[in-house]
């Protein structure tokens, strides 16, 4: 009986005690093509390929929720894009304008380039959290 209880606790507790889970609600997704990809970055890795926390979910019109596991407490900025063609990168025009929907936490605006970390920054507490922002399509 004790062995069964210990086994059950070993299975249930890790799932229930996931520290720092972050739900990212990405709005204004225009179609069900491809995936919505999210990166949650600290200041040193913002806008870099080296963001430690990433996730994706199948696209659907409206809102898509992407769960990012294991984000420790701290200051972060999130970026998301609608990878409509499934190539894993943001496609751009000759002038560098994104061809696919793109967005940043706090709905930070892109003005002749990406926003600053300070404009997109949010905090994650010990219990994780939930943030929401919308994609913008330039084409």
Predicted features by range, described:
Residues 100-138:
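Extracellular beta-sheet/turn segments enriched in Thr/Pro/Gly and aliphatic residues
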Residues 74-80:
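A short tyrosine-centered beta-strand micro-motif
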Residues 22-29, 38, 133:
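A short, amphipathic beta-strand motif
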Residues 64-70, 133:
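Exposed aromatic-hydrophobic patches
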Residues 48-61:
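Short, acidic Ser/Thr/Gly-rich low-complexity loop/linker segments typical of extracellular
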């Amino acid at each position: 009986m004790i062995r069964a209880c210990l086994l059950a606790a070993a299975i249930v507790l890790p799932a229930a005690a996931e520290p720092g889970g972050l739900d990212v609600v990405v709005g204004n997704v225009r179609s069900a093509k491809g995936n919505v990809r999210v990166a949650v970055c600290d200041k040193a890795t913002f806008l870099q390929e080296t963001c430690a926390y990433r996730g994706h979910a199948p696209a659907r019109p409206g809102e898509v929720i992407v769960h990012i596991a294991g984000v420790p407490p701290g200051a972060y900025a999130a970026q998301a894009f609608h990878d409509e063609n499934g190539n894993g990168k943001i496609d751009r025009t000759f002038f560098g304008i994104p061809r696919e929907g793109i967005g940043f936490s706090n709905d930070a605006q892109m003005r002749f380039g990406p926003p600053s970390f300070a404009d997109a920054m949010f905090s994650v507490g010990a219990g994780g959290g939930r943030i929401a922002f919308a994609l913008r399509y330039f084409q």
